[in-house]
Amino acid sequence: MAKSADIRPGITLACTECKERNYITTKNRRNTPDRLELKKFCPRCGKQTVHRETR
């Protein structure tokens, strides 16, 4: 049987403006095979920016 880490891998989210990696989360590969893009607060920029999944 597949482990939960295979289906829900850990990913990091990086700010698109300053490229700092601010957030760590998991995602379900079956539901979202493409890269995540979430609007989150970046402490370095001091505002909400788009954070993209990095590998």
From Swiss-Prot:
GO BP, sorted A to Z: translation
Highest taxon of source: Bacteria
Molecular function GO labels: structural constituent of ribosome
Keywords: Ribonucleoprotein, Ribosomal protein
Ranges in a coiled coil: none
Gene3D superfamilies linked: Ribosomal protein L33 (2.20.28.120)
Ribosomal protein in keyword set: yes
One GO CC annotation: cytoplasm
Coiled coil among keywords: no
Pfam families in the cross-refs: Ribosomal_L33 (PF00471)
HAMAP family in UniProt: Ribosomal_bL33 (MF_00294)
Family from the record: Belongs to the bacterial ribosomal protein bL33 family.
NCBIfam families per UniProt: PRK00504.1 (NF001764), PRK00595.1 (NF001860), rpmG_bact (TIGR01023)
Descriptive protein name: Large ribosomal subunit protein bL33
Originating species: Bifidobacterium longum (strain DJO10A)
